[in-house]
A protein has these predicted regions:
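Short, compositionally biased
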Residues: 1-107, 174-187
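Ser/Thr/Gly/Pro-rich, low-complexity flexible regions
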Residues: 39, 67, 76-77, 112, ...
Length: 187
């Protein structure tokens, strides 16, 4: 219980665990990033911080910030959807999310894009998840980068991806690039 309790936007009854959907999609994170951070808009509109990584020049690597340690995928997805809608931008992953249709009980959350921490949970359970996906006729998670809904706090042009097979975090993938995405929901 309380597996997703750090995401204050999730309905109270959806704090027990996460479900990975059977199919996957792909697309860009956002077609527009010159206007600034989604995070600036999100915080100004009452959402929790949507960043997840920063670049550590001394270590030549991307490092998780304090928000990357929280399960904030639902919060970040709702913020990205609001930002995209208000500014009339396009987002391949939001369009795919809107188009993705599954039957699910009313007592679960809407579908959303995982944050860094949620993708790390998927990575830590990928063997069981892939076996379950395969048994249910779904597509298994691949050895490739998957979008998270976490921004890079030092570059509005970048968002984080995680490889669910290796756990490898890339904090600086261009938002205009195409990558895979696997939606989840909370119960």
């Amino acid at each position: 219980d309380n597996a997703t309790s750090t995401d204050k936007l999730l309905p109270a009854e959806c704090k027990h665990g996460l479900v990975v959907v059977l199919g996957e999609s792909s697309g860009n994170w956002s077609s527009e990033y010159s206007a600034g951070y989604v995070n600036d808009w999100a915080v100004a509109n009452g959402y929790q911080n949507t960043t997840g990584t920063y670049y550590d020049g001394g270590a030549w690597s991307y490092v998780k910030n304090e928000y990357a340690k929280l399960l904030l995928g639902y919060n970040n997805t709702m913020a990205l959807k609001g930002y995209i809608a208000q500014n009339a931008y396009s987002s391949g992953i939001i369009e795919a999310l809107t188009a993705y249709s599954i039957q699910k009980p009313a007592s679960v959350s809407d579908l959303y894009i995982p944050s860094i921490s949620e993708m790390e949970l998927i990575y830590s359970n990928v063997g069981v998840i892939n076996a379950s996906l395969q048994a249910a006729g779904g597509s298994v998670l691949e050895n490739e980068a998957y979008w998270t809904v976490s921004e890079n706090q030092h570059s509005p042009a970048n968002a984080a991806t995680v490889n669910p097979m290796t756990g490898s975090l890339q904090g600086g993938k261009l938002k205009s690039a195409t990558a895979r995405v696997r939606f989840i929901f909370a119960f």
